[in-house]
Amino acid sequence: MRLNVEVVLLILTTPNITPTGLVLVSNAVVSWCGNFRIRNGLCGIRNWLRSLGNRFDIMAQDLLRGERVLAFDLETTGISTNSDRIVQLALLGVDSNEAPIHFETLVNPRMPIPYGASDVHGIYDADVRGQGDFSTIADETFELIDGAVIIGHNARNFDMKLLGSEYLRMGKLPPKPKVVLATLEVVRRLKIARPHNLGALCKRYGISLENAHTAAADA
């Protein structure tokens, strides 16, 4: 979980953060804290968040206290959220009582993994041959994600959509997180220089990323 969270917090505390970025973050704050009211418009939001400086990480921890907060990442057979399948799933974080959660598993997609996908994440047909398919982890995954705060680099437009397709394929409704925070959306809205992939962002902000393109490492 720390990688995606650290990317957000380090971006937020840089001196040249833009008003657009501040508005985006304030919206996330509002979604986590329903009784928050914006009273002074954009200027008030900007000044308030800038005044927090490096204390924003402490504030974020306070806002999320009592929530199940999970970094989420998938490795898949491809990039289609409708037809491709999960080959690895990771959910890392804390429960509402601050107990650690580390759920990481390989998944048999019941289809050949294309070589192009294997070249990216290093998972081959032989690695998943003895694993269960998604139906064997569907219930546990649902219980973890439903009602949780989910953080991932492209979680809203890719991971959650592809996960939803797996559930619909089984004839089940997918879990509904309380909120999904996609770090990719944050960096794009802040107009941070490309590249926007997680590895490049971690390098830019001095965050160690080992075993990139495994679900647990990316989460």
Model-identified regions with their sequence ranges:
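Acidic donor-binding loop at a coil-to-helix junction in glycosyltransferase catalytic cores
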Residues: 217
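A short, structured active-site edge motif that brings together acidic residues
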Residues: 176-187
